């Protein structure tokens, strides 16, 4: 996995993409398999990641994730390459392009299997196979992607508890595969085919022994031969990315996107919490969706209809809800079966207009799924668990009580719920009485619920939990039905989702990863994370997944582990704990370590069924009244995990909230206000030091012995021989011929002397940014030294050693250099401090009309060792004139050229050495000016701060020698003060916290202040003595001010070395 990190642009959201694996890649060599790797790119932003190389495989597995920063119009392109042939230009294996308008639909939907396509329609490369990915929003706390297992045919599932369900087939059945590898089953007794694996007779609740009546349903009178399903439709796990058949494939999200079985990723579930279930499938017409959301009282289900302006899919998409069955007198009445059964792949005739007509065998009427109108009133089939007679008395599919009976007729597309639910104008959802709206009533249109993002994510979470008994074969996914299923792949999809609705009610299922239905996580402009309830418009600091009476501080460190990288724990003025995310510069009350499993544990152990947190909004009454028989049918453990979270709401009038300029409504009502994210540089540095300390080995030393005369070359040879982990060990430096023992002071002096040599422009590695400004930039002509890239690698390692061990370098770079080190783009404003004249010229060009004034082209002349070299800013730029239309492009290219002119290789070598010690993600909280202070410290010296943070030993503030000492310091120039500070501490730079944070001996707890020690027993002819490891200067008791001034100046300017008298 790449270690690259890219800066976050304004207005972007963070999305984590997981590249799980690829399937059935094209084999282009006869004797060897490819070495595939995948490349992820955000178009137009420069964000590029590459997976590791999978050796010799047509089904590579990477399981790598990357965090992308996506804007509103950003698209994602994923390409697969063969590393063996990429250098020959023939390693392309396929690509997938996910446009911006589909990214939102795929976020949180689990793993998706996408077909690979060509880069352009003119490509002759053979492309085949699929890639399996997932997208997950990372702007809020999440538990990450669940585990996944890819079957031999490319289907994705969670780790099943066992493979006991794959028993031998019943007598008369045979397993076959289609040309594309999909498994289907042939019943030789009835001469029929089906996708779902049949069960042995006698299995409770899921028996698939077909009765004669059922066999009549599944038998096609025209299929006398035993062939594979003719022209099987593509599985709904595959998303068609073809655009006009050839172009780079854009993802086309259909109504079945949220019902694909590839999203059924789950953790293994204990067997003791499972029980037989029977599917109650509900089928929708193309272009419409059905949703299964939990009611707060009896788990009522609402139906969602996609707006008619969304594209309709050419294949049927089916959903289903699972019902936990119990013995009861209320049985679901099964309508008469159809007499014209269909084979699974072909069940939907097509109208001349290109729309698919779905035939209901009960009413013998066809309905066209074009615009949602003209739907005939039809009784419900038993596969939906509803009939026209009992629709008014049964509450919801999740509370239906009936014996395990199945109707083998193809699913009918039209569903009439017992209670129509419609959204009100203000966003709240209201529902009429179930009895007042009989199922299947005429009218031609159906009302629908406006599903919020939180509801969609909850439904996706429910589907992930529900597949407890999934196995490796696609046909055996979910609770199986022995009959045929209509709608091609859609019919199989409906039965695969047979246990989706019970997932949220199963306490043993994997805990949900997203927020409860109706909730959304948002961030204020000041970086404060809060939760917004969409139906009521109420905002709160409190995470709705955590009970209000639960204190997360009760959890031990062993249970939740340490804070993630870049996070810090603080407390408000009232003592409430909150957390600071330095990576994204946000604050929140929710502990980022609370994963889904911990949240599930909290809810199970401490939350009564009626007291789940809902962010201060009372749970509304259920939209569907529950009958006593329906309520009794719900077992105690079937209480939804988020039962107090509103999912369907009655029509209410929201009370007016006071409008706060900088905070949403409702956030000031609580007792504690979440602090804003502050640009606390000291706090960031403290967090960085904590992270670096965890990376430092507990034993061993990084030993360097160099001479003062050859400090540059000897340091270069020693450091370039070391490994990165050796440089992270405790640094110990010794100068040859000196007796100084390094407790930090010798290392500071070594870095001070080395940085002055290393950054000296006379060596040709760096140059001053301009004549009157002594900031440094990389010299584009450093190539005169054939080993210059190795030296830049050494410079990067030296910068990393200084930062890792808490030291400062004596030298400063330009602001664009630090921005490049942070992987931030360079803008026109960055050039002002480096070249003011050029900045004024380019700014005037942007603000003025240059037509007929400037005759420049997209090329620049550069003087390299006396020779004029023309550099084209873009291909063919010498012949492209700069006009009013393209001047902004010219300025952008020119600014990039000004700072990257001939230094790309040098900077990459330097950055490589730096990142070997300091991972780039640790520097994300810092900007370029803060990084400058981290590397170089503060060059200006504040005498008052120095005096106020000085410790006195064997003297007081009123001692004569101490008063004289400060008089001498005040009389010194800035350069002499820096040399005095370097003489005493080993470094001429002040830490960014000031003199109160001067670092003392290595391993000391806390800082060590500057110390003046008056040595009374030392002759006054001696010079002052410095102890750099302890930041201490020993002053003899000089008799006069002038003597003290002369001796101190002589010691600063002329002494050199340790233990030298």
UniProtKB/Swiss-Prot annotation:
Keywords: Developmental protein, Phosphoprotein, Repeat, Transferase, Ubl conjugation pathway. Residues 207-225, 233-255, 264-273, 348-359, 379-392, 417-439 have a biased composition (Polar residues). Pfam families: C2, HECT, WW. Residues 1-116 form the C2 domain. Residues 167-200, 513-546, 561-594 form the WW domain. Residues 274-300, 311-322, 360-378, 393-409, 608-617, 624-656 have a biased composition (Low complexity). Residues 480-494 have a biased composition (Gly residues). The active site is at residue 1029. GO terms for molecular function: ubiquitin protein ligase activity; ubiquitin-protein transferase activity. The keyword Isomerase does not apply. PROSITE patterns: C2, HECT, WW_DOMAIN_1, WW_DOMAIN_2. It catalyses: S-ubiquitinyl-[E2 ubiquitin-conjugating enzyme]-L-cysteine + [acceptor protein]-L-lysine = [E2 ubiquitin-conjugating enzyme]-L-cysteine + N(6)-ubiquitinyl-[acceptor protein]-L-lysine. Its EC number is 2.3.2.26. The modification Phosphothreonine is found at residue 412. Interacts with phosphorylated MAD. This is E3 ubiquitin-protein ligase Smurf1. The gene is Smurf.
